[in-house]
Amino acid sequence: MAGHSQFANIKHRKGAQDAKRAQKFTKLIREIIVATKQGLPDPEFNSRLRSAIITAKKENLPKDRIDAAIKTASGNNQHDNFEEVVYEGYGPGNIALIIQTLTNNRNRTAAELRHALSKYNGKLGESGSVSFLFNHVGLIAYKASSINSFDTLFNTAIELQALDVEENDYDEEKMYYVTCNIQDFGNVRDQLFKKFSDAEFSRLFWKPINITTIDDEELQKRILNLMDVLENNDDVQHVDSNFIFNTKI
C-alpha cells in the first residue's frame, strides 16, 4: 500500500528499546510524570496520562511503579521537572532525524546528542532545519490481528476526521496506522479506544513527506549504530526519520 514505508522504522526501534528493561521503564515513568503534570492525575480526565498508562501496562511496568510515578508528579522535586524538547539533525547518508526528548537538563541532552551525531558523521541542526521534511501528526497504531475489519476501522477513523488509515506490511506482524491532525489527536484516539479497545501504542509522530532509500550495507550499519546510541539515551523518547533500507540487515 502506498505510503506504508513511512512507518517502516517504528516497529524496529520499539523492539530495540524493549531489550533493555530498566531503561524502558525509565522512559515510561518519565512520560507518566509529564502527562500527569500537564493535566489531572486521573486518567479518565487526562487522555495523555491514559495513553501513557496503557503503554506502560503493555510493557509490563508494575502497577505500584505507575502509581508511584503519578504521585511523584504532584511533588516539587526539581529533578522530576522534565520538559519536552525536540531536536533536529542529520545522520549518516544525510538522513533527517527528529529526536523527541523528555529532559531535566537541556544542556546535557544537547551535548550528548551532538556528540552522538558527530561520531557517526551527522550533525545537530537548528530548529526548523529538518522539520519541514515531515508532517507532525497524531498516530494511533493497532495490530491487524486485533481489528476484525479494516474497512470498519477506516470508516470510523475518517468519520472522526482522521487524515488516513494505512496498512503496514513491512514488518512480520501487520499493523494499521491511523494518522490525524495534532489538534484532533486526543479525540480520535479516545473514540477509537472506545470502539476498538486500546491501541498497541499512540503518540505524536513526525511523518516523513518523502523517503530516502539506503542501499549501501555499510551505511545501513552506521545508521543502525547511531539509532542504538540515540535510543539508549535515557532522555530520548522517540526518534523519527525519513529513511528506509532497501534490504534488511
UniProtKB/Swiss-Prot annotation:
Principal subcellular localization: cytoplasm
Pfam family, one: Transcrip_reg
InterPro entries: Integrase-like_N, TACO1_YebC-like_2nd/3rd_dom, TACO1_YebC_N, Transcrip_reg_TACO1-like, Transcrip_reg_TACO1-like_dom3, YebC-like
An individual GO BP term: regulation of DNA-templated transcription
Record-level GO cellular component terms: cytoplasm
SUPFAM superfamilies recorded: YebC-like
Entry GO MF terms: DNA binding
Stretches the record annotates as Disordered: 1-21
Keyword tags: Cytoplasm, DNA-binding, Transcription, Transcription regulation
Signal peptide: none
Location(s), subcellular: Cytoplasm
Family: Belongs to the TACO1 family.
Protein name: Probable transcriptional regulatory protein ERGA_CDS_03720
Organism: Ehrlichia ruminantium (strain Gardel)
High-level lineage: Bacteria, Pseudomonadati, Pseudomonadota, Alphaproteobacteria, Rickettsiales
